[in-house]
Amino acid sequence: MGTGNDTTVVEFTLLGLSEDTTVCAILFLVFLGIYVVTLMGNISIIVLIRRSHHLHTPMYIFLCHLAFVDIGYSSSVTPVMLMSFLRKETSLPVAGCVAQLCSVVTFGTAECFLLAAMAYDRYVAICSPLLYSTCMSPGVCIILVGMSYLGGCVNAWTFIGCLLRLSFCGPNKVNHFFCDYSPLLKLACSHDFTFEIIPAISSGSIIVATVCVIAISYIYILITILKMHSTKGRHKAFSTCTSHLTAVTLFYGTITFIYVMPKSSYSTDQNKVVSVFYTVVIPMLNPLIYSLRNKEIKGALKRELRIKIFS
């Protein structure tokens, strides 16, 4: 972290979502409940897939890693946010703030890549079923998952590399509930446009690339489904994609609001609300989205419950 002539900032104070004690008490209970559901839902998905051998397929391997990423994503933000509801001020040392930003960006980026990998998996399964075992072999799955985490780490280090070159010598109050890059950038004493544009280009490139993979995959899927003569076949093919499409729409809808829309078109409070949705709410919703409409997941869950009850 760069130094200036004035006192160097050693910690950042997060202003959180609200200063009203009553509102904070209500929000604490709400988000504590959301976090518990997030952990239980995603851990259940991971355990269920690991224990059910018939779910050891590429689609569920990706879903298992998506659940892990959602746990990491939510855990990067929610515990600190919960503390902010119990205290008037929540302070994090500079190293803690850097670590939180690194974790959020890593897991958020990995989620983008995993959603793209899942779209490609659906494309191969529906458009080229005879080549599925070759195109989605265990080796290919390992590469796609590994690239997802590697992409997350590279993007995170882009943010951290720029952040560590900034000087913080004045105000230290971050108008957010976690150490996000944009609010931190506003507090920097040194104003270099390069440190603003590099993370934006990095994130923007990843969003565009993964959206293109998802869009192209679903265009081919739609064309293939429309060519099917059987109504039952169409319904079955489309039903395998609805959960993923729902998750993609929710995640990329909020990400687009934050990173694509002009910052002058929305306020800091709106930014906070949208950030809550994609860092806290979506990780809770994903297990529900992927399990409620999935017969294999529900079937595996029923079998596990029967084993527990009768054992």
Swiss-Prot record:
<feature type="topological domain" description="Cytoplasmic">
    <location>
        <begin position="47"/>
        <end position="54"/>
    </location>
</feature>
<dbReference type="Pfam" id="PF13853">
    <property type="entry name" value="7tm_4"/>
</dbReference>
<keyword id="KW-0812">Transmembrane</keyword>
<feature type="transmembrane region" description="Helical; Name=5">
    <location>
        <begin position="197"/>
        <end position="217"/>
    </location>
</feature>
<dbReference type="InterPro" id="IPR017452">
    <property type="entry name" value="GPCR_Rhodpsn_7TM"/>
</dbReference>
<keyword id="KW-0297">G-protein coupled receptor</keyword>
<dbReference type="GO" id="GO:0004930">
    <property type="term" value="F:G protein-coupled receptor activity"/>
</dbReference>
<protein>
    <recommendedName>
        <fullName>Olfactory receptor 5P3</fullName>
    </recommendedName>
</protein>
<feature type="topological domain" description="Cytoplasmic">
    <location>
        <begin position="293"/>
        <end position="311"/>
    </location>
</feature>
<keyword id="KW-1003">Cell membrane</keyword>
<feature type="topological domain" description="Extracellular">
    <location>
        <begin position="76"/>
        <end position="99"/>
    </location>
</feature>
<dbReference type="GO" id="GO:0005549">
    <property type="term" value="F:odorant binding"/>
</dbReference>
<feature type="transmembrane region" description="Helical; Name=6">
    <location>
        <begin position="238"/>
        <end position="258"/>
    </location>
</feature>
<feature type="topological domain" description="Extracellular">
    <location>
        <begin position="161"/>
        <end position="196"/>
    </location>
</feature>
<feature type="topological domain" description="Extracellular">
    <location>
        <begin position="259"/>
        <end position="271"/>
    </location>
</feature>
<keyword id="KW-0675">Receptor</keyword>
<feature type="topological domain" description="Extracellular">
    <location>
        <begin position="1"/>
        <end position="25"/>
    </location>
</feature>
<dbReference type="InterPro" id="IPR000725">
    <property type="entry name" value="Olfact_rcpt"/>
</dbReference>
<feature type="transmembrane region" description="Helical; Name=2">
    <location>
        <begin position="55"/>
        <end position="75"/>
    </location>
</feature>
<feature type="transmembrane region" description="Helical; Name=1">
    <location>
        <begin position="26"/>
        <end position="46"/>
    </location>
</feature>
<dbReference type="GO" id="GO:0004984">
    <property type="term" value="F:olfactory receptor activity"/>
</dbReference>
<feature type="transmembrane region" description="Helical; Name=7">
    <location>
        <begin position="272"/>
        <end position="292"/>
    </location>
</feature>
<keyword id="KW-0472">Membrane</keyword>
<keyword id="KW-0325">Glycoprotein</keyword>
<comment type="similarity">
    <text>Belongs to the G-protein coupled receptor 1 family.</text>
</comment>
<feature type="glycosylation site" description="N-linked (GlcNAc...) asparagine">
    <location>
        <position position="5"/>
    </location>
</feature>
<keyword id="KW-0807">Transducer</keyword>
<feature type="disulfide bond">
    <location>
        <begin position="97"/>
        <end position="189"/>
    </location>
</feature>
<keyword id="KW-0552">Olfaction</keyword>
<comment type="function">
    <text>Odorant receptor (Potential). May be involved in taste perception.</text>
</comment>
<feature type="transmembrane region" description="Helical; Name=3">
    <location>
        <begin position="100"/>
        <end position="120"/>
    </location>
</feature>
<keyword id="KW-0716">Sensory transduction</keyword>
<feature type="transmembrane region" description="Helical; Name=4">
    <location>
        <begin position="140"/>
        <end position="160"/>
    </location>
</feature>
<feature type="topological domain" description="Cytoplasmic">
    <location>
        <begin position="121"/>
        <end position="139"/>
    </location>
</feature>
<dbReference type="InterPro" id="IPR000276">
    <property type="entry name" value="GPCR_Rhodpsn"/>
</dbReference>
<keyword id="KW-1015">Disulfide bond</keyword>
<feature type="topological domain" description="Cytoplasmic">
    <location>
        <begin position="218"/>
        <end position="237"/>
    </location>
</feature>
<keyword id="KW-1133">Transmembrane helix</keyword>
<dbReference type="GO" id="GO:0005886">
    <property type="term" value="C:plasma membrane"/>
</dbReference>
